Amino acid sequence: MNDLVPLSSLKVGTTCKIDSILTDEHMRRRLLDLGFSSGTIIKCVQYSPSGDPIAYMLRGTIIALRKEDAGDILVQEGGGHAWD
């Protein structure tokens, strides 16, 4: 089993599966509404020139998150396609 890492630590091109979201209820609800839920396959697609925000592909959509918010999402690297 792979170790869990923060979503914000992924390199461009890395695909992973969301394990958990460790943030306050308001932000958790917002992330869930955007499709960031446990078991979702997600891919890091681009860093902005300054490194923040970071763009991720999940469920056929590209969404940018602030590095701070992405750090609250724990993922398991490997497998799957971000567009599944």
Model-derived regions, located:
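C-terminal structural segments of small proteins and small subunits
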Residues: 55-84
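Generic secondary-structure boundary/loop-capping signal
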Residues: 4-7, 28, 62, 70-72
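SH3-family beta-barrel domains
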Residues: 1-19, 75, 79-84
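Amphipathic, hydrophobic secondary-structure cores in small proteins
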Residues: 12, 16-64
